[in-house]
Regions:
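Helix-loop element at the rim of GNAT/NAT acetyltransferase active sites that forms part
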Residues: 9, 21-34
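Short hydrophobic/aromatic beta-strand element in the GNAT-like acyltransferase core
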Residues: 33-35, 46-50, 61, 91, ...
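Conserved beta-strand in the GNAT
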Residues: 50, 57-67, 72-79, 88-93
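Conserved GNAT acetyl-CoA-binding A-motif
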Residues: 108, 115-128
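A short beta-loop-alpha structural element at the N-terminal edge
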Residues: 3-19
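Conserved catalytic-core motifs of GNAT/GCN5-like acyltransferases
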Residues: 125-127, 137, 142-157
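Conserved acetyl-CoA-binding loop-helix of GNAT-fold acetyltransferases
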Residues: 94, 100-113
Length: 164
C-alpha cells in the first residue's frame, strides 16, 4: 500500500475506464446490473478518486457527487444544516484480493483529505449496503434513519461531518 498512487482522475480518461470496470465487477455484475451510457454520463460532474498499484492497476476507487445535505439526516449533529453543500459518496470499491487489508480505510482517508483540502464542503453522506455498515461506522459515519432497499439490497443512510 505504501507504493499506491492516490489521485483524482478525470471522467472519460483511461484511468476512469479502469475504475468503471472495477465498480462493475464488484458492485454491479453480482446483482445482474450494468452501467448505462446515461448513468456514466451523469458522473461527468462528479469527483473520481482512485488508488493505483505500481503496475498501474486500479486497487480502489470511489465517486463523490456534489449535492446538498439531504432531509433524511434527522438525527444530525448541530453543524449538519439541511441544504448545506455536501458530497454524496458512492460506488466505493476495493479490489477483492485487497479487501480486509486496510485499502478501504486508506481510500476513505484519502477521500476525506481531498474534501478538506480541495473544497469548502464538510458534510459527506452515503447509502451503505447493510453488510458494510460497520466499516463506515469505523471511519466515522453515523446511521440516519431506517433501513431501505436500493438495487434490491438493504441499505442504511449514513453521514459524517468532516473537521479540519
Amino acid at each position: 500500500m505504501d507504493e499506491t498512487l492516490w489521485q483524482e482522475i478525470a471522467w472519460g480518461r483511461s484511468e476512469y475506464a479502469l475504475t468503471v470496470a472495477l465498480r462493475h465487477t464488484l458492485l454491479r455484475a453480482p446483482l445482474g446490473l450494468h452501467f448505462t451510457k446515461e448513468a456514466l454520463d451523469a458522473e461527468k460532474d462528479s469527483i473520481h478518486l482512485a488508488g493505483f498499484d505500481p503496475s498501474g492497476a486500479v486497487s480502489a476507487c470511489l465517486v463523490l457527487r456534489p449535492s446538498v445535505t439531504p432531509s433524511w439526516i434527522q438525527a444530525a449533529p448541530p453543524e449538519a444544516v439541511l441544504d448545506m453543500p455536501a458530497y454524496h459518496l458512492r460506488q466505493v470499491a476495493v479490489r477483492q484480493d485487497l479487501q480486509g487489508l486496510g485499502w478501504g480505510r486508506a481510500l476513505m482517508d484519502y477521500a476525506h483529505a481531498w474534501v478538506l483540502d480541495k473544497s469548502p464542503v464538510r458534510q459527506v453522506y452515503l447509502h451503505a449496503r447493510s453488510s458494510v455498515v460497520g466499516f463506515y461506522e469505523a471511519t466515522g459515519y453515523k446511521i440516519a434513519g431506517e433501513p431501505f432497499l436500493e438495487v434490491g439490497l438493504e441499505h442504511r443512510a449514513m453521514h459524517r461531518f468532516l473537521e479540519s
